[in-house]
A protein has these predicted regions:
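N-terminal Rossmann-like dinucleotide-binding module
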Residues: 1-50, 368-370
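Stable alpha-helical structural segments in soluble proteins, enriched in small hydrophobic residues
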Residues: 42, 281, 285, 312-322
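Rossmann-like dinucleotide-binding domain that binds NAD(P)(H)
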Residues: 150-227, 231, 304
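Beta-loop-alpha module in the N-terminal Rossmann-like domain of NAD(P)-dependent dehydrogenases
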Residues: 13, 19, 40-41, 51-115
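A contiguous active-site-proximal alpha/beta segment in oxidoreductase catalytic domains
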Residues: 78, 96, 101-167
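Local beta-strand N-terminus motif with an aromatic residue
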Residues: 31, 52, 68-71, 146-149, ...
Length: 371
């Protein structure tokens, strides 16, 4: 394509900034239109990025009028499915939806159907797949640098769907998208806690078995210092990764930790510091989306991978609900945590609904941002 792809954004809160950053930094897009319930959110977006865009408080009007090539869905979780389905009906070339893919597996499956029947490419914004540290670790594992992976250990927080869907996606990416065979997990929920209007647990533990023999263990809200990254234990060595660096220990390193801090395609790590994770990941994600539109590659964040990351999260809830090991795929298409609470199986001991992301809303809104 000789020109730039026209992008429309649905939902102009904090996560949309990562999408806009990515589109602008890779240089292959123009931001044409914004849709949000709050005019000030769109005005702030224009001001922050020096944009001149058309504004809509009705996203369907934007979809009908703007002849968009790409749509970003950046609402809260409950809006991901309805707005992806709505956008697909207007047949853009691609949709980039924030993670987690949806609030239920059934809704995620409807997103897949809507995009498939309309010929629309759908990607889920697990942008850490585009971080050079993660890709370096993936390549070291596939090259046998630590032998057979035996355990991946990671720590999460702020609820499984939001934070830890990045973890389950990371496990699969590090293992070259190996398939998860079964999941065993449990949760504690003594408060009526939500995250972006999605019901979450107070803490959780999940164990994931992969077909290739590796296992992963996730501790969520069980340790004070959670982070994006992992410790990876193999038969012949170890990796300790964060979003910026990879530490390798094996026979070739003389039993000492070897530190690597790889730069990205778009940015150098030392130039951006903590912004590197967001700016490099976002630009890489957007750049590969353009390549996917042009049929040069299959996007590594394609919706099938996003769906499988969500399945693994819901498998933890389903394991807690059924008190059993859950063999994949998960067959319950509603949220198992919702089932537990609404059936009385898991009643909060300390009633009173609260949302840990309510501070992100504008005006009088306290509980929802999905219309």
């Amino acid at each position: 394509m000789s020109g730039k792809y026209r992008v429309g954004i649905i939902g102009c809160g904090g996560m949309s900034r990562n999408h806009v950053n990515g589109y602008l930094n890779c240089g292959r897009y123009e931001i044409a239109a914004l849709a949000d319930l709050n005019e000030s959110a769109m005005t702030d977006m224009d001001s922050r990025y020096k944009l001149t865009t058309n504004h809509y408080t009705d996203a369907r009007e934007m979809l009908a009028k703007e002849n968009l090539d790409v749509v970003s869905v950046c609402t809260w979780h409950g809006g991901h499915a309805p707005w992806t389905i709505a956008a697909a009906a207007y047949t853009p070339k691609a949709i980039l939806c924030e993670k987690p893919m949806a609030d239920t597996l059934g809704n995620a499956e409807q997103m897949l159907v809507a995009c498939r029947r309309n010929g629309v490419k759908l990607a889920i914004a697990h942008q850490r797949r585009f971080l050079p540290a993660y890709t370096l670790a993936k390549n070291l594992i596939s090259q046998g640098a630590i032998g057979q992976v035996q355990l991946i250990q990671s720590f999460g927080g702020d609820g499984l769907p939001n934070y830890s869907s990045h973890k389950t996606d990371m496990y699969r990416y590090l293992l070259s998208d190996d398939e998860c065979e079964w999941v065993m997990g449990n949760i504690e929920r003594k408060t009526d806690q939500y995250e972006r209007s999605t019901r979450i647990e107070d803490c959780a533990l999940g164990v994931f078995q992969f077909k290739g023999g590796a296992r992963a263990m996730l501790l969520s809200d069980l340790v004070p210092n959670h982070y994006q990254g992992a410790k990876i234990f193999g038969s012949d060595g170890m990796l300790d990764i964060t979003t910026e660096q990879v530490m390798l220990l094996n026979k070739e390193t003389g039993g000492k930790w070897d530190l690597q801090e790889p730069d990205g395609k778009f940015f150098k790590l030392k130039e951006l510091g903590k912004r590197f994770e967001w700016d490099e990941g976002g630009a890489g994600q957007a750049d590969e989306l353009a390549d996917w539109i042009e049929d040069k590659v299959v996007h590594r964040g394609n919706a099938q991978n996003g769906y499988k990351a969500l399945q693994m999260i819901h498998a933890v809830y389903e394991s807690a609900r059924m008190h059993e090991k859950v063999v994949m795929p998960v067959r319950t298409r509603v949220n198992p945590l919702d089932l537990m609470v609404e059936s009385g199986h898991l009643t909060p001991e300390r009633p009173g609904r609260y949302d840990i992301r309510a501070f992100l809303l504008r005006g009088e809104r306290m509980t929802s941002d999905t219309e």
